Amino acid sequence: SQITADMEQVFQHLASQHRISGLHALVVAPFQLHRCMMQHVHAVTASARAGQAARIVLKMNALTDESLALALAEAGRAGARVDLIVRGACVVPAGAAGFSDGVRVRSIIGRYLEHSRIFYFRAGAAEHMYLSSADWIVRNMFRLIELAWPVRDPAQRQRLIDETLTAYLHDGRDAWIMDDQGHYRSVVDLRRQPGASAQHALVARYGGLAGGGAAWT
């Protein structure tokens, strides 16, 4: 497959500094990943300015790369809906008037320490989703070998949207919501009662597959 052929090039590079060229599916840092993500954000921004569908949902551990952060803020100002699910540091303020309008930021701090990264972009009729090893930070983008790979199968893409992105955007138990000053408040405090936990829902669905028997409650 294209991905395995690309992975062969990556391993050859790691073993011998073999030049990586002509990749079919993988996007590799420090070579193309930052540029690829910027291109997707700019495409969403252009769609928003044209009055077309414009959506970004990102799930990661940290977002501190300045140029990517500014591009996301610009997308929000242009009218795109931008949701950032960032467990740790995030330098994009949520909904700051005149700077990051249209941007929402939340952190999920539950029982499990997660490391999944999902990047979703919709620009007009075009949808793109990537899974990745990289956070949007300078070290990952420019100093380490990191990978992102596209989710091209529509059914698998929708499954990730439903089971992960949508669930985490509606988490009513473990979420912390950023305000326009960069401060976080617990979603439980904001709603005055706990709601559903995205992590709990995933464990209830898949916990038995790990051989641990009953799902965590």
What are these regions (language model features)?
Residues 1-17:
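Mobile "lid/hinge" segments at catalytic clefts and subdomain interfaces of large enzymes
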Residues 10, 26-27:
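Solvent-exposed, charged helical/coil patches
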Residues 4, 18-22, 30-217:
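PLD/PLD-like phosphodiesterase catalytic module centered on the HKD motif
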